[in-house]
Structures are given as structure tokens and as C-alpha cells.
A protein has these predicted regions:
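Conserved protein kinase catalytic-loop anchor
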Residues: 185-187, 205
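Active-site activation/catalytic loop segments of kinase-like enzymes and analogous catalytic loops
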Residues: 221-257, 271-290
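Juxta-kinase regulatory segment immediately upstream of eukaryotic protein kinase catalytic domains
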Residues: 1-20
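Activation of the activation-loop gatekeeper triad in protein kinase-fold domains
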Residues: 208-213
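Catalytic-loop of the protein kinase fold
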Residues: 187-189, 194
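ATP-binding pocket architecture of kinase catalytic cores
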Residues: 26-149, 156-184
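All-alpha amphipathic helical-bundle segments outside canonical DNA-binding/catalytic cores
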Residues: 259-271
Length: 320
């Protein structure tokens, strides 16, 4: 690492912790198309520096300053998240924040397939429901910058793609024609799924990646982990490739008293697939336009067609 950049990390961690520390060599972790994640130890304490990447992958992503505030609110509400230490406005030219580095597995495919995590997978449905109930109890007034999402926002985003995608358009039409009764909006994680959690042999360690937090129907958050893309090849396990939906829904209803019905999950599962399909297209266009040449973004363009196929499957299920 260039000496000046390392010094910037040293200064940032010192500022965030509020004390002089010596840090290890920062290591850039794999993944994270929209944010960088750097592992670093400060006087032996494991930390993670979350830093803005070049450009903005999605226009509705929170700034890191706002994401840090959401993380802090979640931590203080009792949600299992990394301890937030401090926000830094300028780390080598980009904003960042410093938080605890949790130990465990984060790679989705490993979480759903590793034999040593089999027992954990049995615990995760109830554990995920318990944490999501806490997320939805975060006082919205603490986070006045959060905006409300809507089906209409997805329509606008698809229009900006400016090419025909009839499966997505049909999905959006169906969603507008079959809206369930609106529930009271709550603070939502916005990307609550396997791949944004830390897991060890005892189950859930913590929730990560709060950059899509917003105000919404709680069932939208509850159902996002059902999207097929987040099953990582274990398609028979509808809940994120780890298990069945029933214990997850039962535990969430028990804790919140909302009495969410399975057909509501079905509706928002389709909405989640439509949102992810549009996300794949818009991110792939960053590569195709030359704005941000990236193999990862190009791959998302191919994945988008798989999600469109899933939308057709879910529409067929809805019509049965």
C-alpha cells in the first residue's frame, strides 16, 4: 500500500476511535461493488473500514454518513450489528466509517452449502425473524433522512433503461393491479438476505450492509430473502437457500403481532425479483456505457435474464 494512503487509514481509524492507535496493514476484502471493505487491526482489535467506492452503483443508496447513522440506530436498538465507532468525512478523498469486524462467514454460497454450518442453517430462520422484528422497531424519527420506496419508483427506473423487457413490465403491471392492503411503513433494512449477514456455527452473528435502508411496508423487507438469486443454488430451500419459510414467518408474526399472510409474502417476493432484475439492468448499463468498466457489472446483465425467467415463473404461480 502507498505510504500516504496507509497514513490516511491510520488517521481515519484514530479519528473514529477517538484515541491514538497503531494499525495493521489494511487489507481490501473481496466483494462490495458499491462500497469498499477494508480489514484492519487497531492495537490488535479487529475493525472494518467501510469506504465509498468510485461512482454510485444505485442512486437510492444512502451516503456513508447516513448509513452510519442507521447502523448506530440499529446498534442502540439492540439489533445484532457490528459496533459502530465513527464516521470519517475524508479518507484519501472519500467518505468512510469504522466499525467492529465480526468473525464468521459472509459469502452466501458458503453459508448455504458448508457442511460445518448445517446446524446453523437450522437455527437461522427463527434468528433472522427475531433480528428483523428488532429492525422494524427502530424509531423512524431517529432517521428523518430515510425516504419511502414505492412500486412507482421501479417503473421510473425501468423507463430509464430505455429498452424493452416485457417480463419485467408485466411483473410491474401485476404488482400495481394486485397490491395488498398497505401496512404502516417502518424502518427497513432494504437488502435483508443471505449474503448480507455474518454466520458462524451457532447461527446469526450480525447484519451487514445498511446502504439501502428506507421506509416501507415491513413485508417487503421480510420477503426479500426469498428471491431466488439469494438461494445461491439451493433452490429447494425457499428462504435464502437455508430452510423453509414457515418457521421464519411464524416467529416474525409471534414477535410483531402483524399476522402477515403467506400470500403477502408471495406478492413481495415477486416485487423483490422485479427490483433485482431492474437493478441488474441498471448496473450492467454502467459497464456498457463505459462509465464503469467492470466484469462484475457485465455479469449482472446476464443474470438479469435469469431473474426475468423467475418473474415469469412467479406470475404463473400467481395465476394458478
Amino acid at each position: 500500500m502507498i505510504a500516504d494512503v496507509r497514513e490516511a487509514f491510520q488517521a481515519a481509524v484514530t479519528e473514529a476511535l477517538g484515541r491514538e492507535v497503531e494499525i495493521s496493514e489494511p487489507v481490501l476484502l473481496a466483494g462490495g461493488a458499491s462500497k469498499e471493505a477494508w480489514a484492519v487491526d487497531a492495537d490488535g482489535e479487529p475493525l472494518l473500514v467501510r469506504r465509498a467506492a468510485v461512482g454510485v452503483i444505485h442512486r437510492h443508496t444512502l451516503s456513508l454518513a447516513h448509513e452510519f447513522e442507521v447502523l448506530r440506530a440499529a446498534f442502540e436498538t439492540g439489533v445484532k450489528v457490528p459496533r459502530p465507532y465513527g464516521y470519517v468525512a475524508d479518507l484519501a478523498g472519500r467518505e468512510a466509517f469504522v466499525m467492529e469486524r465480526l468473525e464468521g462467514e459472509t459469502i452466501g454460497r458458503r453459508i448455504v452449502q458448508k457442511p460445518e454450518l448445517e446446524a446453523a442453517r437450522g437455527l437461522l430462520p427463527a434468528q433472522l425473524a427475531e433480528e428483523l422484528a428488532k429492525v422494524h422497531a427502530i424509531p423512524a424519527e431517529r432517521l428523518p433522512f430515510l425516504t419511502a420506496a414505492a412500486i412507482e419508483r421501479m417503473v421510473e427506473e425501468l423507463d430509464e433503461v430505455d429498452e424493452p423487457h416485457p417480463a419485467i413490465e408485466l411483473g410491474l403491471w401485476w404488482l400495481r393491479e394486485n397490491r395488498p392492503p398497505a401496512r404502516q411503513p417502518v424502518v427497513c433494512h432494504g437488502d435483508f438476505r443471505i449474503g448480507n449477514v455474518v454466520v458462524d456455527e451457532h447461527g446469526l452473528v450480525g447484519l451487514l450492509d445498511w446502504g439501502f435502508a428506507h421506509l416501507d411496508d415491513p413485508v417487503r423487507d421480510l420477503s426479500f430473502g426469498l428471491v431466488r438469486a439469494w438461494r445461491f443454488g439451493m433452490d429447494s430451500r425457499r428462504l435464502g437457500g437455508i430452510g423453509d419459510v414457515e418457521p421464519y414467518l411464524e416467529r416474525y408474526n409471534e414477535l410483531t403481532g402483524l399476522e402477515v399472510r403467506p400470500e403477502e409474502l408471495d406478492y413481495w417476493e415477486l416485487a423483490g425479483n422485479v427490483a433485482w432484475a431492474i437493478g441488474c439492468l441498471t448496473q450492467a448499463q454502467r459497464h456498457l456505457s463505459g462509465l464503469d468498466r467492470s466484469v462484475e457489472l457485465a455479469i449482472l446483465g446476464r443474470l438479469g435474464s435469469e431473474v426475468e425467467y423467475e418473474i415469469c415463473h412467479l406470475l404463473e404461480r400467481a395465476a394458478a
